[in-house]
């Protein structure tokens, strides 16, 4: 992607996958930077942390924003070097798997609960019926899948997990057993879109709770999972405090939980949970993949009344419900009034569902097809 953005510019490119370049960067970083003058993109920079001190000196003396684009596939190593040497001198952009709008070439505008914005998204998006939505969910959104370089998603995810566990996870701790970690990931995937229950995950994975917490942190840091925290406000009482867990890529969830096809998934016991995961992750990615923070929460009180998503934006709270139905009624929006006691005013609401076109439930709530997000 960055190489595409570089086209037509004077920016150079070097990858430290090249062992000769890597050796030079490690043994003589000053000479390396003389040969690869900024502006430059240095890929897999985590292999030569010796560069960071020299990049820091350059940044302090030249004040050229964007002089160095640094990328890496091993997050822990990369971020350790950045935090140690480049704190305050670097902007960090975490790249998740692709959003559906990116895959379709429909633009990169973040999702907003605004009628004009929704109609514009509808014009650019690629329509899909229920079968088509579950095909997207099952196939996943990894770049290699989206670009059709790998037509068999099951083979891709098998290889992806082997590489991921052997390289990124084992790098953090040689003591991590690969088979146990895979069983742990399967236990986590089986609980996507649920309130986090570390005890149950640990029990299913046959590990202790401390291990489960540590391994969840690994999954979060490596950009595999994320959490929606419950919306909290001093004026709202009796709210739960446990976050809900989601995966950025539903194709990985489907592989881990062993669904054999999109058709079987659509009728299966996890169809609602994985559909919710898909919608939440897609909305989050429309923000994250443009370098913006998504202020997404969920609402649940001690009476088990719940709103799937609460989007805080532009001074209002937008409640969002996710349903598999293609004919949503006004009864689905009644729960939105639970936010009326919050100190932040309630804005427009949305039912994200299988309806074929953007529409309205009433003056304050919209119907949004899942393919539009």
Predicted regions and their residues:
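A short beta-strand-to-loop transition that corresponds to the Sensor-1 phosphate-sensing loop
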Residues: 71-75, 81, 89, 96-98, ...
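Short glycine-rich substrate-engagement loop in P-loop NTPases that contacts/grips substrate
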Residues: 10-39
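Conserved P-loop NTPase "ATPase switch" module shared by AAA+ and STAND
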Residues: 35-51
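A cross-kingdom feature that marks ATP-driven nucleic-acid transaction machinery
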Residues: 1-16, 36, 217, 223-225, ...
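Interdomain hinge/linker elements that couple catalytic modules in large macromolecular machines
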Residues: 100-101, 105-281, 288, 294
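Catalytic P-loop NTPase motifs of RecA-like helicase/translocase cores
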Residues: 20-22, 47-49, 77-78, 145, ...
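Conserved catalytic/switch belt of AAA+ P-loop NTPases
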Residues: 52-76, 80-85
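Short regulatory helix/loop adjacent to the ATP-binding pocket of P-loop NTPases
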Residues: 76-92, 104-109
């Amino acid at each position: 992607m960055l190489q595409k953005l570089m086209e037509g510019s004077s920016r150079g490119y070097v990858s430290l996958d090249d062992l000769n370049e890597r050796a030079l960067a490690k043994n003589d970083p000053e000479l390396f930077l003389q040969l690869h003058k900024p502006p430059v993109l240095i890929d897999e920079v985590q292999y030569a942390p010796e560069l960071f001190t020299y990049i820091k000196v350059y940044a302090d003396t030249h004040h050229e924003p964007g002089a160095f684009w640094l990328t890496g596939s091993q997050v822990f190593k990369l971020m350790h070097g950045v935090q140690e040497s480049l704190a305050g001198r670097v902007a960090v952009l975490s790249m998740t798997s692709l959003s559906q709008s990116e895959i379709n070439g429909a633009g990169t505008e973040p999702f907003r609960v605004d009628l004009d914005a929704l109609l514009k998204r509808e014009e650019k998006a690629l329509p899909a019926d229920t079968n088509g939505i579950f095909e997207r969910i099952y196939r996943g959104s990894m770049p290699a899948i989206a670009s059709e370089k790998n037509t068999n998603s099951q083979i891709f995810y098998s290889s992806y997990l082997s590489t991921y566990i052997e390289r990124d996870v084992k790098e953090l701790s040689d003591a991590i057993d690969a088979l146990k970690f895979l069983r742990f990931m399967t236990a986590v995937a089986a609980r996507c879109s649920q309130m986090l229950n570390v005890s149950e995950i640990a029990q299913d994975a046959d590990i202790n709770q401390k291990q489960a917490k540590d391994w969840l942190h690994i999954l979060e840091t490596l950009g595999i999972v994320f959490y929606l925290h419950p919306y909290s406000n001093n004026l709202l009482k009796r709210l739960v405090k446990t976050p809900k867990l989601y995966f950025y890529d539903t194709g990985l969830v489907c592989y881990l939980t062993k669904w054999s096809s999109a058709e079987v998934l659509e009728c299966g016991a996890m169809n609602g949970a994985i559909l919710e995961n898909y919608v939440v992750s897609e909305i989050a990615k429309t923000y994250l993949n443009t370098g913006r923070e998504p202020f997404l929460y969920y609402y649940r009180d001690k009476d088990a009344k719940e709103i799937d998503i609460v989007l805080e934006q532009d001074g209002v709270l937008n409640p969002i419900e996710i349903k598999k139905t293609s004919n949503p009624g006004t009864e689905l929006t009644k729960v939105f009034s639970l936010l009326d006691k919050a100190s932040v005013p309630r804005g427009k609401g949305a039912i994200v569902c299988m309806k074929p076109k953007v529409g309205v439930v009433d003056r304050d709530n919209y119907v949004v097809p899942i393919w539009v997000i």
